[in-house]
Amino acid sequence: MGLGASSEQPAGGEGFHLHGVQENSPAQQAGLEPYFDFIITIGHSRLNKENDTLKALLKANVEKPVKLEVFNMKTMKVREVEVVPSNMWGGQGLLGASVRFCSFRRASEHVWHVLDVEPSSPAALAGLCPYTDYIVGSDQILQESEDFFTLIESHEGKPLKLMVYNSESDSCREVTVTPNAAWGGEGSLGCGIGYGYLHRIPTQPSSQHKKPPGATPPGTPATTSQLTAFPLGAPPPWPIPQDSSGPELGSRQSDFMEALPQVPGSFMEGQLLGPGSPSHGAADCGGCLRAMEIPLQPPPPVQRVMDPGFLDVSGMSLLDSSNISVCPSLSSSTVLTSTAVSVSGPEDIGSSSSSHERGGEATWSGSEFEISFPDSPGAQAQADHLPRLTLPDGLTSAASPEEGLSAELLEAQTEEPADTASLDCRAETEGRASQAQATPDPEPGL
């Protein structure tokens, strides 16, 4: 005896309705529920007519297990039940239950909802509970709304047995009430009665189970109060999943670490504990969950792309002709860079090894300043864009890798003050220029 697989509501909508199930009867042992269960099949015979088929098949299977198909109005499902009809169980009938042939729909409509219950009333003395009790049957057949009130009036001052279903306990019980119009209040029962669509028993799913108090529905995130703290260094009560790529906890994606859920306060404890603490060693072995810092990669360095063309030459300084020596024994080196030459104002000549390394040449011939780069692949193209400077006639300076000084000597010359030989040569040059201006040209014809 037991429950089998459930199915949907059968066609026809009629069967034998169980009104009452006796204690320790074969029907109770099989799990049949009063008021909600309808026997629709016994063996392989469909019970869709009001006849003696049910009684005949029960008598034919006395002390033998027989299968019944039962429809439940509360779950709206059909289940299979195995029952053993017997006349040896100590009560009346082979099943120990009272049945009546009717339709499912009409049986679900005949429900009287108990509303407010007055204190010391006949309903309160009988133990009726307000708003949770539903009167579903009695010793007599109740088919209409007025049948219940007629039954109460006919039992004035007499005990009356009622079958009552309680929605909180989800069970039916038998209640004995004695209607009394002189109890001191209104009505014969002293309670409100509701009837109709809004007062029917609510249907329940077949898989519904009572949950313990405080249980969390599936899929609900746990709050802080529901988390259980475990001491550091102790193994957790659940298995820790290990990733095949390594012993790290969490999943690593794009240089970011996904931290596992941590107990509040454990993050600070994990940071305060040093590498030599006992809990730190236990955490390295994978024995406990500890807080992990999320490694953050620094941003890549900013790559700046320089302008490949020539820069503005207005901010750079050019050679001062007054500092150029005309002595044949001294050769001056011109500062040449690959970017620009300035023509702003008079500045001292700085020395560099760039002209020596590149093999550059600077020449003052006549009144033009020319620069050439023989070793450069684009020397001809760059020479057209270089500036030209007009200098006095007779001043010429040439620098070549063979005749020029080394980079170290040139730097030493720029740091040291001009020697006396350079000053003498400079004075001689200025004297010759002044004589040439003072001496007038001979007039033609004299």
UniProtKB/Swiss-Prot annotation:
Its annotated compartments are: Golgi apparatus, cis-Golgi network membrane
Q: For bias kind Low complexity, which ranges apply?
A: 343-354
* Residues that bind Zn(2+): H17, H19, C102
Q: Residue ranges of region Disordered?
A: 1-20, 202-252, 343-446
A biological process (GO) of this protein is: protein N-linked glycosylation
Per the record, lipidation of type N-myristoyl glycine is found at G2
What cellular component terms from Gene Ontology apply here? Golgi apparatus; membrane
- Keywords carried by this UniProt record: Golgi apparatus, Lipoprotein, Membrane, Metal-binding, Myristate, Phosphoprotein, Protein transport, Repeat, Transport, Zinc
Bilayer disposition of the protein: Peripheral membrane protein
What is the recorded post-translational modification? Phosphorylated by CDC2/B1 and PLK kinases during mitosis. Phosphorylation cycle correlates with the cisternal stacking cycle. Phosphorylation of the homodimer prevents the association of dimers into higher-order oligomers, leading to cisternal unstacking.
Q: Which residues carry this modification: Phosphothreonine?
A: T216, T220, T224
Please give the residue ranges the record annotates as the region Essential for interaction with GOLGA2/GM130.
Answer: 189-201
Residue ranges of domain PDZ GRASP-type in the record: 14-104, 110-198
Q: Which residues form the signal peptide?
A: none
**What positions are modified (Phosphoserine)?**
S365, S367, S376
- Its main localization is Golgi
* Loss of function: phenotype: No visible loss of Golgi stacking in intestinal tissue at postnatal day 10, 21 or 42, in combination with conditional knockout of GORASP2/GRASP55. However, cisternal cross-sectional diameters are reduced and rims of the Golgi cisternae are vacuolated. Abolishes expression of GOLGA2/GM130 in the cisternae.
Q: Where is this region: GRASP?
A: 14-214
Does Calcium show up as a keyword for this record?
Answer: no
Q: Function of this protein?
A: Key structural protein of the Golgi apparatus. The membrane cisternae of the Golgi apparatus adhere to each other to form stacks, which are aligned side by side to form the Golgi ribbon. Acting in concert with GORASP2/GRASP55, is required for the formation and maintenance of the Golgi ribbon, and may be dispensable for the formation of stacks. However, other studies suggest that GORASP1 plays an important role in assembly and membrane stacking of the cisternae, and in the reassembly of Golgi stacks after breakdown during mitosis.
Give the family, as the similarity comment puts it.
Belongs to the GORASP family.
Task: Identify this protein by name.
Answer: Golgi reassembly-stacking protein 1
Q: Which organism is it from?
A: Mus musculus (Mouse)
Which gene produces this protein?
Answer: Gorasp1
